């Protein structure tokens, strides 16, 4: 029999940089005193922003929520290629960065718009024979990966301060922004890695409505529980 104190729904959390998505799961479990907690779409430790936490019966719609489009804002750094494709990795190559005309930068971004295939990075949670690729990468191993069919619905170059470029991208499920940045760097001929990333939207949900990790840690349980969106509320928001 279920207790009246059990919580079902989705909690919007604004993940801080430097922590894993699993760290947020553990903090949420403690804050709500419940074991049944999942998350919708891993954010790398470097990244901040919206993480949908599924609570109780909310875990049953986790796959549905994960399938929705995402919006990110980020900063790429031209001239350095890293093994993880972001600033947390080891630098593999350093190249000079020309004074690119804006038209050339626009064209590089435009090449990765609409439908295309993307090769997942070795430093990722994708599994090969049950082993996450990032564990194989730590052992210095590289394995064949299947390219993924992805879609960019919208992109915007927000500012150019070479070697850095700030951008916004709206993309499909399974999209790696790190790889997007890496591929743009290859297109420009000088390499690039992801310096900063923030997820701002996931489906109909916006980070402006999220609880911070500090608020989550501070509690109390009742205050955190009050921020959980009920399953009927989720259906209404999604237009289901």
What are these regions (language model features)?
Residues 1-240:
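Catalytic/RNA-binding core of pseudouridine synthases
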